[in-house]
Swiss-Prot record:
Protein task: Nuclease that induces DNA fragmentation and chromatin condensation during apoptosis. Degrades naked DNA and induces apoptotic morphology.
GO CC annotations on file: chromatin; cytosol; nucleolus; nucleoplasm; nucleus; protein-containing complex
Cellular localization per UniProt: Cytoplasm; Nucleus
EC primary class: hydrolase
Gene name for this UniProt entry: Dffb
Regulation: Inhibited by DFFA (DFF45).
SMART domains (alphabetical): CAD (SM00266)
Organism: Mus musculus
BP-aspect Gene Ontology terms: apoptotic chromosome condensation; apoptotic DNA fragmentation; negative regulation of apoptotic DNA fragmentation
SUPFAM superfamilies referenced in this protein's UniProt entry, alphabetically: CAD & PB1 domains, His-Me finger endonucleases
Protein name: DNA fragmentation factor subunit beta
GO molecular function, one term: enzyme binding
């Protein structure tokens, strides 16, 4: 039997696809449902009420226990609501398919907002929904290319160049270490360096890591250009879930330049000195192993600046992979001088 209260209960009622919310007074669940359908011009058959916060259905039995000003949602046949989770899902859908109306409304709210936290949230929303991620060429998104040389005609080309520049920088650091190698071993060091250089040229300095148009196995991003932080060198993943899409807008492109391709086994402290010592030892060095540590994702992690730990990693090269398996006589050892001190 439908419970009828002596005093009407006042609640706040909204419909699923309506931005309006009304105060409605009723003595029973059925009366409230009827008034709600009239207010929102919805069909009564199949309609029901639920709590806005968690989607619990409001029945005749639980209606008397509702607090005054409870927020309820009116659902028609076939509609569902899971509480705040549904609200968050609808909010997130804005990022995937932003509409001009949403952007305009957010800008209006931001212009009138005084609270710093709400300003930050609205500004972040505008930043993300205003991105022109799908655009690729200078003609499609001229603002993205502001400050870049005219030779860059598309986003993927510039991001590929950006990655190549980082890898070239690592190569220069390895080359600069030549003077630290014993004079008698420098020729072999330069030979190994030359092999690495040829390998890098053949793969275009691994510029594909930042190119969203590259094969999935060759890039560090999604086909849309989203990069996820891989976390500090001593963790499996990023606990803060940092992500960025430098293809979206100019600001994101600039911010992405602060992300690091961090060597898990450190380049200056460990990899390069170990390479030099191995060459001075006289055996044939497995230069491909050192190449992988210096220039490839085997030993590189893409990390947000907050996840880039500057502390000593205290990780060593795999001793079993430093030299090639000996199949003949041992190469004559070069004259050895004092080993160079490891750079700190």
């Amino acid at each position: 039997m439908c419970a009828v209260l002596r005093q009407p209960k006042c609640v706040k009622l909204r419909a699923l696809h309506s931005a309006c919310k009304f105060g409605v007074a009723a003595r029973s669940c059925q009366e409230l449902l009827r008034k709600g359908c009239v207010r929102f011009q919805l069909p009564m058959p199949g309609s029901r009420l639920c709590l806005y916060e968690d989607g619990t259905e409001v029945t005749d039995d639980c209606f008397p226990g509702l607090p005054n000003d409870a927020e309820l949602l009116l659902l028609t046949a076939g509609e569902t609501w899971h509480g705040y989770v549904s609200d968050i899902t609808r909010f997130l859908s804005v990022f995937n398919e932003p509409h001009a109306g949403v952007i305009q409304a957010a800008r209006q709210l931001l212009s009138d907002e005084q609270a710093p936290l709400r300003q930050k949230l609205l500004a972040d929303l505008l930043h993300h929904v205003s991105q022109n991620i799908t655009a690729e060429t200078r003609e499609q998104d001229p603002s993205w290319f502001e400050g870049l040389e005219s030779r860059f005609r598309n986003k993927s080309g510039y991001l590929r160049y950006s990655c190549e520049s980082r890898i070239r920088g690592y190569l220069r650091e390895v080359s600069a270490y030549t003077s630290m190698v014993d004079e008698a071993a420098q020729e072999e060091y330069l030979r190994v360096l030359g092999s690495m250089c040829q390998k890098l040229k053949s793969v275009q300095y691994n510029g594909s890591y930042f190119d969203r148009g590259a094969e999935a196995s060759s890039r560090l991003c999604t086909p849309e250009g989203w990069f996820s932080c891989q976390g500090p060198f001593d963790l499996e993943s990023c606990l803060s879930k940092h992500s960025i899409n430098p293809y979206g807008n100019r600001e994101s492109r600039i911010l992405f330049s602060t992300w690091n391709l961090d060597h898990i086994i450190e380049k200056k402290r460990t990899v390069v000195p170990t390479l030099a010592e191995a060459i001075q030892d006289g055996r044939e060095v497995n230069w491909e192993y050192f190449y992988s540590l210096l220039f490839t994702a085997e030993n590189l992690k893409l990390v947000h600046i907050a996840c880039h730990k500057k502390t000593t990693h205290k990780l060593e090269c795999d001793r079993s992979r430093i030299y090639r398996p000996q199949t003949g006589s041992r190469r004559k050892q070069p004259a050895r001088k004092k080993r160079p001190a490891r750079k700190r």
